[in-house]
Amino acid sequence: MVPEYSRFYNILGYNFKDYTLLIRALTHRSKTKKNYERLEFLGDSVLSFVIAEVLYKQFIDLAEGKLSQLRSKLVKGATLAQLASSLKMDEYIILGASEQGGHKREKILEDVFEAVIGAIYLDSDFATVKKVILKWYQPIISSINLDTIKVKDSKSKLQEILLQNALSLPEYSIETIDGKDHEQQFTVVAVSKDLNLRVKAQGTSRKKAEQKTAEKMIEMLSQQGLHEKK
């Protein structure tokens, strides 16, 4: 065990055999080309499957659509960032000079959380990483209130409105990215060809900007008499 990471291992509930995997998982691209991005990709898939499986087994009467909404809620940025902070990951993130001050940035915390999962998977096996993930998520999963999944995010709600009215889904694209790496502002444009609508909004991440864009389009559809059918 590397001494400076012994406390972190205890917090994670996992001891790395190959600590270089953990270093890679904590390293932002601003520091070096050997960063967490590939591990993040792997961890995202592992996490999504583990959460999907536990929800499938725990909520046996829940329909597929509701399971998808609940999984989305559990693996979205805010939840991952909160878990990363509770596990003190922000204290160990390795950033380059251009990203100093970004330890608390939600997108970075989200990415590192997924990267650490990917690193644990490569360092051990699926059964082990699943056990670790479920330990981290236990307080959240045990307190799930099924009523909360009735609340859809704006993109999902917009999608349902359009599909219910036999309209094609909007196309989202990034128009601009402004600001320094740790305080970027994304401008996203959503286009509905069927309705000849073009809407834009800003957010501190692409996901947030897309949600705000969807909110605006929902408001415009409402003015035209298009609402979600219950």
Swiss-Prot record:
Cellular component, GO annotation: cytoplasm
Ranges for domain RNase III: 5-125
Name under which the protein is recorded: Ribonuclease 3
Cofactor: Mg(2+)
The EC number(s) this enzyme carries: 3.1.26.3
Source organism per UniProt: Francisella tularensis subsp. tularensis (strain SCHU S4 / Schu 4)
Role of this protein: Digests double-stranded RNA. Involved in the processing of primary rRNA transcript to yield the immediate precursors to the large and small rRNAs (23S and 16S). Processes some mRNAs, and tRNAs when they are encoded in the rRNA operon. Processes pre-crRNA and tracrRNA of type II CRISPR loci if present in the organism.
Lineage: Bacteria, Pseudomonadati, Pseudomonadota, Gammaproteobacteria, Thiotrichales
Catalytic activity: Endonucleolytic cleavage to 5'-phosphomonoester
Pfam family, one: dsrm
Primary gene name: rnc
